[in-house]
Amino acid sequence: MASLKEMRNRIASVKATQKITKAMQMVAAAKLRRSQDAAEAARPYARRLAAVIANLAAGVTGDGAPPMLAGTGRDDRHLIIVAAADRGLAGGFTSSIVRAARERIETLIAQGKDVKIVCIGKKSTAQLRRLYSDRIVEDFDLSAYRQFTLTVAQPIADVVTRLYEAGDVDVVTLFYSRFKSVVIQTPTALQLIPATVDGANAPAAAQGAQAVYEYEPSEEEILETLLPRNLTVQILSALLDNMAGFYASQMTAMDNATRNAGDMIKRYTLEYNRSRQAQITKELIEIISGAEAV
């Protein structure tokens, strides 16, 4: 059994850890509010831009469709972008994204597809490099950025555009964590190329179907400009969702750690009191026995 001094040191150590986890929880909560506001503010812009592209795409057919919209006509070469965190202590936040990406990667490899990977965040890079080091073509460390803007997303979009225009990839898919609430963040796969123009954007396109528009310049020329911008915006929106999800996961993880530390302190304190009481009782018995012997 540990001595009383060792038990006191253990209790003090856990209390110090509890103070750290509590402070980290409060910091994560403050950053979560800012990150959540930024993510929610970016979504309407991203949705509206996608809706504009859907409306324009409805008037483009055949060979006039830009490459980012029409695609290459093949799906043999895939680029998987895995956006996760640069820091840890956030529960299973990064692991859930990497797990979803790995499932897609393994499926594509089993189908004989050529798979390339772009990693965003040191944690995703560390996990995927152990498994697919020969498939990673680029990795991005965003730990130096406190806020994500278009200037952060642009270099990532440039790499995607370069690989696509060089004919190295046919399909580009981004894996990230969709922020829904503090307790719900869902690993999500978003196809970036060929650009998707249906689904959530269909109602917006349908509303414009009743009117006939004449565009100057043409729809094709406008799309040639908007599609690269849309690529950057969709990546930025995913990064902002990721940041909010990371701080939500970290806040939850630190809250759980603080509670667990409290439980450990109670348990260690109880053990300490019992040991101290037993030691006092033993000393009293020795004193009484000695007095009776005299």
Curated annotation (Swiss-Prot):
GO biological process: proton motive force-driven plasma membrane ATP synthesis
Top-level taxonomic group: Bacteria
Entry keyword set: ATP synthesis, Cell inner membrane, Cell membrane, CF(1), Hydrogen ion transport, Ion transport, Membrane, Transport
PROSITE patterns: ATPASE_GAMMA
GO CC, one annotated term: plasma membrane
Protein's cellular compartments: Cell inner membrane
Cited InterPro entries: ATP_synth_F1_ATPase_gsu (IPR035968), ATP_synth_F1_gsu (IPR000131), ATP_synth_F1_gsu_CS (IPR023632)
Quaternary structure note: F-type ATPases have 2 components, CF(1) - the catalytic core - and CF(0) - the membrane proton channel. CF(1) has five subunits: alpha(3), beta(3), gamma(1), delta(1), epsilon(1). CF(0) has three main subunits: a, b and c.
Family membership: Belongs to the ATPase gamma chain family.
NCBIfam families reported for this sequence: ATPsyn_F1gamma (TIGR01146), PRK05621.1-4 (NF004146)
PANTHER family assigned: ATP SYNTHASE GAMMA CHAIN, ATP SYNTHASE SUBUNIT GAMMA, MITOCHONDRIAL
Name used for this protein in its record: ATP synthase gamma chain
Protein species of origin: Caulobacter sp. (strain K31)
